[in-house]
């Protein structure tokens, strides 16, 4: 059975029939929750949460690629987003790319991405390293701009019902 990793209780409200691991915000917390789920025997991880859009994307979207918007080792001749001594920047594929960072985004990040959050990259990387299947859906709650904090507070709960409709109709596998 798939396990869900969700940052906040309000994003998980009403979801039944799946083990839910509430991670809290940020990449370290997301990694800890992911390892707990994997150590509990889950071989398929689903992430749901809110995200800001730095493009024209709206609604509930499936993320196809993940980048770390905090990683900057250009002084070591790495590309922006590349972890030293590792190949590549993106986990997954181009399409809808999520840039994860430990700073709540109030402006477009320097690294190329379509949406921004605080957890998905860490979950994707952990699953990739551990050989666990992973998929992620994000509800666009704000435009990652100067109004994003207020917009996020107003909209964070709105994606839950859309995600549940998809989850229960079996469209995840």
Predicted feature locations:
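Structural motif
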Residues: 5-9
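Glycine-rich phosphate- or other oxyanion-binding loops that anchor nucleotides, phosphorylated ligands
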Residues: 11-173
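Extreme N-terminal starter segment of soluble prokaryotic enzymes
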Residues: 1-3
């Amino acid at each position: 059975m798939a396990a869900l990793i969700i940052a906040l209780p309000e994003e998980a409200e009403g979801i039944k029939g799946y083990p839910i691991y509430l991670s809290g915000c940020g990449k370290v917390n997301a990694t800890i929750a992911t390892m707990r789920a994997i150590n509990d025997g889950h071989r398929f991880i689903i992430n749901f949460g809110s995200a800001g859009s730095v493009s024209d994307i709206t609604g509930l979207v499936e993320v196809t690629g993940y980048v770390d918007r905090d990683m900057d080792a250009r002084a070591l001749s790495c590309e922006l987003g590349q972890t030293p001594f590792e190949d590549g920047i993106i986990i997954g594929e181009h399409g809808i790319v999520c840039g994860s960072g430990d700073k709540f985004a109030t402006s477009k990040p320097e690294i190329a991405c379509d949406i921004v959050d605080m957890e998905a990259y860490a979950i994707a990387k952990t699953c990739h390293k551990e050989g666990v299947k992973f998929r992620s859906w994000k509800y666009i709650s704000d435009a990652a701009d100067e109004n994003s904090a207020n917009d996020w507070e107003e909209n964070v709960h709105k994606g839950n019902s859309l995600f549940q409709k998809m989850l229960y109709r079996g469209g995840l596998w």
